[in-house]
Amino acid sequence: LITLSTAIDPASEIVRDLFDALPKLAVKDPSLWGEDAKSDAQTRLGWISSPQDAAQLMPKVAALVAWAAERQLDHVVLCGMGGSSLAPEVICKNYGKEITIVDSTDPGQVRHAISDRLSRSVVVVGSKSGSTIETDSAKRAFESAFISAGLKPSDHLIIITDPDSPLEKSALADGYQVLTADPTVGGRYSALTAFGLLPSALAGVDIENLIVDAISATNALTAADSPAVTLAAILGAHEKFSPYFSVNAPHGIGDWIEQLVAESTGKFDHGLLPIVVESSESPGFKEPGTLSISINSPANANLEIQGPLGAQFVLWEWATALAARVIGVNPFDQPNVAESKTKTGLMLENTDQLSRKPDLDFGSVEIFGNSEGATLVEVLGDFFDRIPANGYLALMVF
C-alpha cells in the first residue's frame, strides 16, 4: 500500500535505533522519547490502534448518519480548530465530497456558513477539550441562528468531544447528539478517530475503505522494511541541517502534514517545518540543498511516496513520532501553542494594547514597529533587508 522512492542505509546509527524503537512504538511504549516525555506519552498513544479501534466506532457513526438522513440534513458543516477540522477537510477533498469548514472566528466566514442551507444543515461541533473558545463561539452562533429561524438546535447539532468534557456535559443537558472520542489521542493524531471519521461519513465518504487501507498500512509499517522508519530517518537526519522541507501533495493533505509535523517536532529551537506547495513547479520546491517530498504525484522529488489516503495518515503519524525521537523532542506536547494562547489571553485582558496606533500609516497599509523609510516601498525594502541569510519571510494572513 505504501511505496517510497528512496532507500536508506540499514547500518546507519539512526536507522538501527529506529528499527529497535519500532516494535516498542507498536505496543505503545511511552519511554521512547525520554523520561521527561513519558507522562505525556502514557496518555497520548491511542492513535497507534485507531484503525483497529474504528471498527467499534462504526455502528455509532452509522446511527448518526441515519439520524441526519431521516431529517433530510444533506449539508454538512464542521466547526472545529486545527486537528479537529483538518483531517475531515482532507478526507472530503480526497473523495470529492462537500463539507463546509468553520475554523475561524472571522465574522464573514461564520455568517456565510450560517446563511447557506441552514434548514438542511447538520452542524458537527468538534472540540477535544470541550472548552475551545473559537469552536464554542461558532456553536453559539449556529444555535442562535437555528432558534431565530424557528428550528430546534437539537435537530441539527452533533457534538464530538472527549468523555466528561464540559462540552459533553452541556450537550447532553441540551439534548444534543454526542459522540465521544478516544481521550488518549491528541488532536493532530485524530484523523482516524471520531473527529475525522464522523464528519466525513456524514458528507458521504466511504470511511470503511479508508479504515481498511489504514489497517493494511499499519501491518506494513511494522515489517522489516518499514516505510515509517525510512521516512522518519530521512526527516530526522534532515533536521540536523535544515528545519525546512517542501511537500507537494494533492487534496490538501500537505496542510494536514504541515500541522502534524510542525506541531509535533517544533519546540525548544528544534523541529521541522514543512513548506506546502501546490505543484512540483512551484518556486523553491526543488531548490539546491533542500529536501523535496512528493505524494501520489510524479515530480522527480528527493522522495516520492505512493499510497492511498488511509495509508498516508498512518505512515505520517508513525514517521512523525519516530522522527521526534531522532530530533530529541516530545511529539505530544505543544509548549508554543500554549504560550500563544496565554499571550492572546493577556492581550484580551489588556485591550489598551489592541488600540495602539500604527507607527506609520499609508492609508490601506499600517506599519507597526521601527522602520527606516518615508514611503511604503522604502519601509518594505528595509524590512526585507533584515531577513538573514537562509532566513524566511512569513506572511500571516488573518
Model-found features: residue ranges?
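Flexible, active-site-adjacent loop/turn segments at secondary-structure boundaries
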Residues: I2, L45-G46, C79, S84, ...
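Acidic catalytic cores of enzymes that act on phosphate-bearing nucleotides/polynucleotides
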Residues: G46, V205-I211, T218-N336, L346-F398
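Low-complexity, highly charged intrinsically disordered N-terminal segments
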Residues: L1-V76
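Generic recognition of stable, solvent-exposed alpha-helical segments in well-folded globular domains
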Residues: Q56, A63, L86, V90, ...
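Exposed alpha-helical structural elements
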Residues: I14-D17, K60-A63, P166, N209, ...
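Glycine-rich phosphate-binding loops that contact phosphosugars or nucleotide phosphates
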Residues: A63-T222, L291-I305, L346
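A short acidic, often aromatic-flanked loop/helix-cap motif at beta-alpha or helix-coil junctions
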Residues: D9-L22, P107-G108, V185-S190, G252, ...
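Short, compositionally biased "basic patch" segments
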Residues: R16-D40, G82-K93, H251, E349-R356
